[in-house]
């Protein structure tokens, strides 16, 4: 999926201001109690044309090699097929992998988030990531996404950015030599015919102001690296720590404003090792001619040693467990009746109508001037809802 960069307002920040505070939450992967293991291939390869089927068997807790007593979560990508390894339409797939998330278990809002990760050889077709998704019920990208780290970017992306952060400007990097980060949100200005989701992305800026990738031509796949996102109500910025040297992925700070206010809400953690799809140079689901064949060596094992959340100044919140229960009167199709809470479609909720089953109706509102009315098309089963 092509994502668009926009012009943003800037705030100034000095490197001396970038200091993590106390640790307020830490996941050391002694178990998976905080995590949900996802399965399947999603809708059209998780929306990206990915080629893997996620299985619980591909996620396990292991001891980090040469670090006795230190555990990590290991996500293993394999070349395998079987009767139950299919896409949503039942077509066979040739790869499996793992994906985990903390939705309804752990969420974070602001702070410095750091993770320590070891990536396998992913050349070609691997797409490992540790990232965050907004807890909002809105669909992507209106719920927001923060990519703490991801690798496997296609050649055109790597060539576009390779004059900064260790790049040599020769357009000759491999996927094992480049790692990036990103923040994605919805913007009307990004809604164009070849970007129907309206996803705006700070990593696609050709000037590399807000989120430039990090290059190391000795490869990034033979050692653990640390990755950070610094996040407060005003800004988001990223860094990579390689051999204990912190490399900042920005020259101008990305300023959170009314367009990107998704980042004023809580997010949950996701980690996965995808294969193929439109982020990579490999082909996409259902279209073998769209890219190269998967060539990375299997099994490919990604290790996430820890994830920790630290204060950044006064900011940093972690919630463990489901969202807090709210009581009171909730407005459902009310206009004048006083309520304690409600939902605004397009802001914190979406209206869903089963395609082709309903048309606009003419029932008048019970009160006030606003209402929703549908009529069935008479095609049988019909449905709609608000989420």
Q: Where are these predicted regions, by residue range?
A:
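Extracellular glycan-recognition surfaces and repeat-rich motifs
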Residues: 36-74, 334-380
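Short stretches within intrinsically disordered, low-complexity N-terminal or propeptide regions
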Residues: 183-185, 202, 348-351, 375, ...
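Boundary/junction segments of secreted and surface-exposed precursor proteins
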Residues: 17-18, 319-338
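Extracytoplasmic/periplasmic beta-strand context in beta-sandwich domains
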Residues: 27, 128-129, 144, 305, ...
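Short beta-strands within extracellular/lumenal beta-sheet-rich domains
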Residues: 211-212, 375-387
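Sec-dependent N-terminal signal peptides
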Residues: 3-16
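GH16 jelly-roll
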Residues: 17-320
């Amino acid at each position: 999926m092509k994502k668009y960069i926009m012009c943003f307002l800037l705030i100034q920040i000095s490197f001396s201001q970038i200091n993590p505070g106390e640790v307020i939450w830490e996941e050391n992967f002694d178990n998976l109690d905080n995590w949900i293991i996802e399965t399947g291939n999603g809708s059209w390869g998780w929306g990206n044309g990915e080629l893997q089927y996620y299985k619980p068997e591909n996620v396990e807790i292991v001891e980090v090699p040469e670090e006795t007593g230190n555990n990590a979560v290991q996500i293993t990508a394999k070349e395998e097929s079987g009767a139950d390894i299919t896409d949503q339409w039942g077509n066979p797939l040739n790869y499996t992998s793992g994906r985990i998330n903390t939705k309804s278990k752990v969420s974070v809002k602001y702070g410095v988030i750091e993770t320590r990760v070891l990536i396998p050889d992913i050349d070609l077709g691997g797409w490992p990531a540790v990232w965050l998704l907004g807890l909002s019920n809105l669909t992507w990208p209106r719920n927001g996404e923060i990519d703490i780290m991801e690798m496997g970017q296609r050649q055109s992306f790597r060539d576009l950015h390779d004059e900064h952060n260790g790049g040599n400007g020769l357009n000759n990097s491999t996927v094992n030599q480049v790692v990036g980060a990103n923040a994605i949100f919805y913007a009307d200005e990004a809604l164009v015919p070849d970007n129907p989701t309206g996803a705006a992305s700070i990593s696609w800026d050709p000037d590399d102001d807000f989120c430039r990738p990090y290059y190391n031509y000795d490869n990034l796949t033979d050692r653990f690296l640390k990755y950070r996102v610094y996040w407060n109500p005003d800004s988001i910025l990223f860094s990579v720590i390689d051999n204990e040297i912190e490399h900042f992925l920005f020259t101008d700070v990305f300023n959170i404003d009314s367009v990107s206010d998704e980042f004023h809400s809580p997010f949950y953690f996701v980690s996965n090792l995808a294969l193929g799809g439109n982020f990579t140079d490999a082909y996409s689901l259902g279209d073998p001619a769209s890219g190269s064949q998967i060539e990375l060596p299997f099994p490919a094992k990604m290790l996430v040693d820890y994830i920790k959340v630290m204060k950044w100044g006064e900011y940093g919140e972690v919630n463990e467990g489901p969202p807090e229960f709210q009581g009171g009167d909730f407005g459902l199709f009310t206009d004048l009746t006083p309520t304690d809470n409600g939902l605004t479609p397009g802001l914190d909720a979406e209206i869903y109508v089963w395609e082709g089953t309903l048309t606009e109706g003419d029932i008048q509102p019970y009160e006030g001037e606003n209402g929703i009315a549908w009529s069935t098309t008479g095609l049988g089963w019909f449905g709609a809802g608000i989420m």
